[in-house]
Amino acid sequence: MEERARSRLLRSKATLEQDIKASYLMDHMISDGVLTNDEEAKVLSKATRKEQAVALLETLLRKDNRAYISFYNALIRESYGDLASLLHSDLPLLSPEGEKSFADGVSPSVQAILSVGGVPQRPVVFVSRPPLLNLIREMLYQLRDTPGWVTVFGMAGSGKSVMAAEVVRDRSLIKECFPDGVHWLSVGQCERADLLVRMQSLCFRLEQCQSSDTSQRPPSTVEEAKERLRFLMLRRFPRSLLILDDVWDSSSLRSFDIQCRVLLTTRNRALTDSVSGVRYEVPVENGLDEEKALEILALYVNGKMHKLPEQARSIVSECKGSPLVVSLIGALLREFPDRWSYYLRQLQQKQFKRIRKSSSYDYEALDQAMDASLQVLEAEHQELYRDLSVMQKDIKVPAKVLSVLWGLELEEVEDVLQEFVNKSLLFRDCNQRPYRYYLHDLQLDFLAEQNRDQIAELHKKMVRQYQRFYSKRPPDSADKDSLYWYQFIPYHMAKAGLSKELYSLMFSLDWVKEKARIMGSAHLINDYVEYGEILDKENSEVRVQFQEFLSLNGHHLEQRPFPDVVQLALSQPDRSEVYRQALMQAQKRASRGQIYLNWVNKNIEEGLSRLVMHPHQGAVYYACFSKDGSKIASCGASKALRVFKSTSGEKLLELQAHEEDVLCCAFSPDDRHIATCASDRKVKLWNVERGVLIREFEVEHEEQINHCQFTNTGRRVLLATCSNDKFTNTRLWNPNKKTSQNTMFGHMEPVNHCCFSPNDLYLATSSSDGSLKLFEVSSANEWKSIDVDSFFPESDEEIKAMVKCSTWSADGSQIICAARNTVFVFDVETSDLLLKLKTSRLSTIQFCHACPNSSLLAVALSHYTVELWNFESSKKKAECSGHLSWVHCVQFSPDGSLLLSSSDDQTIRLWETDRVHTSSAVALKRDTDVLSSHSDATIIAPDSSNRLQVLSGSTGAVVLESEELSSRIRCSCISRNAAFVALGSEDGTVQVIEVPSSKASVKLSGHTKTVHHCQFTDDCEILITSSEDSTIRVWKWRTGECMVLQGHMEPVRKFHLLSSSSSPHLFSWSFDGTVKVWDLTRGQMLQDLVCHEGAVLSCDVSSDGRLFATTSANRTAKVWSSASWKMLFLLEGHKDCVRSCRFSWDNKRLATGDDNGEIRLWSMLDGALLKICPRDTKDSMNSYHAGWVTDLHFSPDNRVLVSTAGYIKWWSVESGEALQTFYTMGGNLKKIHVSPDFSTFITVDSIGILYILKRLEGEGT
């Protein structure tokens, strides 16, 4: 019976006893089914009318709401209207609608049942957890027709008891499954005597609910109490639910194995293994989500969630949403609302004793609650559990690691861990095989605090056990269970204070190689940053050397197949410890026949980027720093958003953000959110910490969205976007609303970029209509407009000079924008042009950004470089080379110390602003020639200043440098006696220069277009040149006499000179698809062969002169007979243009290379395909060789093949496997010069760096 009705009966009891005649009323109540004949007989057995009335009312008080209503109706029918009126105001509601109408969702009838059963009321502050409640209810419905057990288990303070009480506040559940009531018993940790008292109390409560007047004595033993309960449940309460709260051990639980329906809460999920009957389990998650936890704190302090201080989120994060901790701190804050920072500090400092009881929880302080779980373990297991103090937060550990730590068999360890899991002392991730184990943050903090004085020793134990177990060989990198050691053994060494062991490990190239193979470079770099202070005490220079090696080669270490780390390390400066270790290892391996190359002329410049990252598969369109500079976000053609540490490149977040290319991303002023915009016309807002979508704004732009940016300060946060729309192309958004707040009108063409002024008062927009506009943010009105196109007088009226981007000076007084190859600096107030900076005429500016605390301006260019300018002095301060394709974006860090650049080459480079400078070394062009001798080589190459340089082949030192030429040098060659150098120019002229005087000997005119190739004959008397004008010229260069070989219809890019006993012949090939053979003495065409339908891209002649091969843009290669001039083999299979070919020295094989980076080896016996190099492994650029295969050379013994494309590779001719790879700084190698003994390799890359590579010989060779 509900409380109000029972109270009314008790208050009216005296009046009713005086007036009613029980015998008249009982007939009606028996008819209604609320009174039995036995109960009527007991009442009538009383001697007097009043005694009968007293007995009837006593019986009625033990009944439910239906009995109250039946009694009320009987009073009406027997004309006791005045008495009925006493009861009328508290009549219970029995209709379903009435049951649901109460504010807290719990009807009085349900509340009455729960009160009788001793179920605790809701806590003062309560937040529902519907998914968990539904799961428990679902399990309880399984007990509707049969007895059984439902176990709700979880760690201390996870909210088990609150959920168990809440789940039965459900009328439907009680009516359908437990109509005979719900009974609650708190068990806890108790001895047998205490357990008997609790069971006696339950027996008494159940007996009170019966109508029997006989009072039984309490049971005197646990066994008797168990039998009494069994009888009561089976006979009197067959469909009731017994809730056992906080059960600790199986012996206590067995005392309630009485074939009834039981819901129990416990920290030990395995308890029900000791009882009979069906069993169901419901795990309770360790923590609430952030929103629920904040809701609890808000309720405690009577505030709104969005008005809670920032410390509230930190408290929730620190305790991982533990319901117990949140409630304890919330209750304390109710008394002391200004102590947010204090309680956060106590949590961070693990001062659990100060977070003391202020709720109905059983323990005085948080540490007591956690210690209680630990005390039930055996002493031996307590020691093992203590060792877990060395675990890191959020790190899941395999059992094999703990097997090493404890020195136990794996099966024994798994048994111990199972016990810890069962007691909610440890958690198991079953989604991984083998299982991974982890501690809740609070448990770990508690352990760390409890064992504070022994932490170093515990870490030392971890290290010593690791060293003992892996003394003979390191952990197997292929074994997933061993990955823990690679990730965390430096951490344990540092925490143990084992500095020497840490130096030895981290200053080892073997360790670097193995860890990089498994985890990539970012983890390693992070280790050098994390433990830098310890390592620097040993040798700060060596620490920097290892860190720089990883930073500059990190993108290579992401490649699969994994590169040879020893070869990468050989490119480090000779003074570097990394180089010293690599050289020792390389010499040992070279003794066994392996190929290693030493870069003898390396000069690692200070201006190189300090960190190279490869975050995306595809172009990186945009990257930006967080406001605190600790993180970098990037996006691009991969459609993904990625966030990583700016110190190491370690990935923090990666998610698929859009369905099309993501063009821009931006951090919010507080760094908690990131906005993204894309080609799919969508703008999205993401939570950085959790990686979840917060909001997808309405699609209001009609075309792709090019850029997005938040305001710089958090006073009034707005997001600006701009797009390719014709009119409504710039919008302002409130991050809390799905629709835009304002639209800025003015541009009639796409807007490429937008940015807020430093004080957020203005928004600058850069448009394809040739203008730069400034809008007032508050009104969205146009404030100023600058016609940038008007500063290009040569501009076509119909094609405007597109303004690509803009940026504000640090003080906001100047606005800087870029169009074509020019940077303009304007005064904001007057719109006057203050300065104009012109970059290379051959490039266009893709992006620019002004340093936030200086007058430096970074400019991203289409010709793969980044330039730094001082926009006050108009001077170029530095040029940053290294990217292999267009640079899309540049941005300074908030403090101006770093500069990032993102590129089409899929990388992001990080530069130190004060270390980059304009290189003193002149960049060479790739149009080189090399003359090899037994002891040395001579290299000639034009440079970026259009001078010819002659360099030493052993050191790369400049021997000679010509005057600057007026027309761009496009080819060069050196005579066999090294006395003369020839140059072919873009204007068609040819010059011969004497060496070493650099005196211009002769200038030859005749070609009308670019000269592509030149070569001296062996006697140095004849110079042959080929040109874009389709002709070949044979010069007696000393006299200027010339013979013209005409016949080709398209440019002649190259030719091949053949010497024979009779007369010299010349092979030439052209884009017209033909190969022609010429007699050089008479200038006569001997053969004119139509070889391919497409352009002929390369040709080679076998060493015996019997065969020649041609390759074409039509994806085929052909082999021809020099005797019959007929085709012998058609070689098909390449999937792209076949750009290079080379016969082996024994003429048994032909190698061909294509624009997809693939190399094929063919038999010259029958034209059969022998090998494909590589077979199926593409690199990070989705190519087999990072670009076109431009050159091929066989070793003299025909066992090795070297190739050039994006880098240099050496291949086994027999197996087709790669033997070695040398990664150049730049890419797009044009050719490689190989010494006759195959020991020296010389090339120049796309950024003008010369490589003289000498093959290392083995030790003692």
UniProtKB/Swiss-Prot annotation:
Principal location: cytoplasm
Location of the NB-ARC domain: 106-417
Repeat (WD) residue spans along the chain: 615-654, 657-696, 700-743, 746-785, 798-836, 840-879, 882-921, 964-1003, 1006-1045, 1047-1088, 1091-1130, 1133-1172, 1184-1223
InterPro entries assigned: Apaf-1, APAF1_C, APAF1_WHD, Apaf_helical, CARD, DEATH-like_dom_sf, G-protein_beta_WD-40_rep, NB-ARC
Domain CARD residues, every copy: 1-90
Keyword Cytoplasm: yes
Any GO BP: apoptotic signaling pathway
Keywords associated with the record: Apoptosis, ATP-binding, Cytoplasm, Nucleotide-binding, Repeat, WD repeat
Residues noted as binding ATP in the record, renumbered to the chain: G154, M155, A156, G157, S158, G159, K160, S161
Membrane-spanning segments: none
Pfam family, one: CARD
GO MF annotation: an example: ATP binding
Subcellular location: Cytoplasm
GO cellular component terms listed in the entry, alphabetical order: apoptosome
Domain of life: Eukaryota
Record's subunit section: Monomer. Oligomerizes upon binding of cytochrome c and dATP.
Function of the molecule: Oligomeric Apaf-1 mediates the cytochrome c-dependent autocatalytic activation of pro-caspase-9 (Apaf-3), leading to the activation of caspase-3 and apoptosis. This activation requires ATP.
Listed PANTHER family: APOPTOTIC PROTEASE-ACTIVATING FACTOR 1 (PTHR22845:SF5)
Stated name of the protein: Apoptotic protease-activating factor 1
